[in-house]
Curated annotation (Swiss-Prot):
An annotated GO BP: protein repair
UniProt record similarity statement: Belongs to the methyltransferase superfamily. L-isoaspartyl/D-aspartyl protein methyltransferase family.
Compositionally biased spans, kind Low complexity: 62-77
Top-level taxon in the UniProt lineage: Bacteria
Swiss-Prot/TrEMBL catalytic activity: [protein]-L-isoaspartate + S-adenosyl-L-methionine = [protein]-L-isoaspartate alpha-methyl ester + S-adenosyl-L-homocysteine
Gene that this sequence comes from: pcm
EC number(s) per entry: 2.1.1.77
Protein name (database record): Protein-L-isoaspartate O-methyltransferase
Transmembrane domains' residue ranges: none
Database matches in PROSITE patterns: PCMT
UniProt keyword annotation of Zinc present: no
Coiled-coil intervals, chain numbering: none
Active site: S175
Length: 327
């Protein structure tokens, strides 16, 4: 190019070449603007879910988001991540909470109802005892406090507060509530009992009642399964002043003597001499005496001197036999 031409045309032809047209034309710009508007709608929907349109956010995404040459990246709305343990997350509301409510709440209500019913029937039982002549308030309170249904088989629990002797296995029975209250009242005679011996633990019910009247209760059972059962029955009550022994009740417990009171829950032809000797001066022994097939009488024996006892024959009763040895 000559100097004159250069002055007239300062730019060369190659300088006038335009850059290649970018893919974004007017249509692309319009699409980008539309995408931005959609993003604003999505952001507004996320910020105010209660007022959001029922249209799913995915339907607001640009149709050509993945097309080549769009040039403007469009952020897709964030989706909630699935739980890491979907099985647990799905089952938790149904099996964890609902089943828990079904198993826990009714059981608590049922336990409360049973406890309330037990207390009410015990009170009615105590009223019957009072009407039949039991007057010692300590004995009545003890009979009211000890749950007799815990000492019988579940199938007999409905009869626990009836005035009836019930079988406890091994040809043994739990004495009638009226007999238990009568024997304990006779043994106490209004005194403060320090040490009491029971012959024939059985299921442990009478020992539990005695534990609320005396400071220390010693109880002997000759039938090993009943001895073990009594321990299990007494364990939930957490009675601290009962000492159970497996042995021959006719021998007594010389090591723990003398006793303020002795209660024998089985009938013999007479009262064993060993037990009379273990009774403290001024102490009282209550026992059924008589033949198994004949008449049995509830007998009170009082020790009035080292070698003198006074006997009183009271009520007709019926008990299982008093036997020697252990099984």
């Amino acid at each position: 190019m000559s100097g004159e031409r250069a002055k007239r045309f300062p730019l060369a032809l190659e300088d006038l070449k335009r850059e290649p047209r970018k893919p974004e034309g007017r249509a692309a710009e319009r699409q980008a603007a539309g995408d931005a508007a959609r993003q604003r709608l999505i952001a507004a929907a996320a910020a105010a879910p209660a007022a959001a349109s029922p249209i799913a956010p995915e339907r607001l995404a640009p149709r050509a988001a993945g097309a080549s040459g769009s040039g403007v990246p469009v952020a897709k709305p964030a989706r909630a991540k699935p739980p890491t343990t979907p099985g647990v997350a799905k089952s938790a509301p149904s099996s964890g909470v609902k089943n828990g409510d079904k198993s826990a709440t009714p059981n608590v209500a049922l336990s409360g109802a049973l406890a309330l019913t037990s207390e009410r029937v015990r009170e009615r039982m105590v009223e019957r005892l009072r009407a039949n002549g039991v007057a010692d308030p300590r004995v009545l309170a003890a009979m009211s406090a000890v749950p007799r249904h815990m000492f019988v088989d579940p199938g007999l629990a409905a009869q626990a507060y009836e005035d009836a002797a019930l079988p406890i296995g091994h040809q043994q029975t739990i004495s009638k509530p009226s007999v238990v209250a009568r024997m304990i009242e006779l043994a106490a005679a209004g005194r403060t009992l320090e040490r009491v011996l029971e012959i024939g633990t059985g299921c442990g019910y009478q020992a539990a009642v005695l534990s609320r009247v005396a400071r220390d209760v010693y109880s002997i059972e000759r039938v090993k399964p009943l001895y073990e059962r009594a321990k299990l029955n007494l364990r939930p009550l957490r009675v601290p002043n009962i000492r159970l022994h497996y042995g021959d009740g006719r021998v007594g417990l010389p090591a723990a003597a003398p006793f303020d009171a002795i209660v024998i829950a089985a009938a013999g032809l007479d009262v064993p001499r060993a037990l009379l000797e273990q009774l403290a001066i001024g102490g009282r022994l209550v026992a059924p005496v008589g033949e198994q097939a004949g008449e049995q009488v509830l007998t009170l024996v009082e020790r009035v001197a080292p070698a003198q006892w006074r006997e009183s024959r009271l009520d007709r009763v019926f008990f299982v036999p008093l036997k020697s040895g252990v099984i």
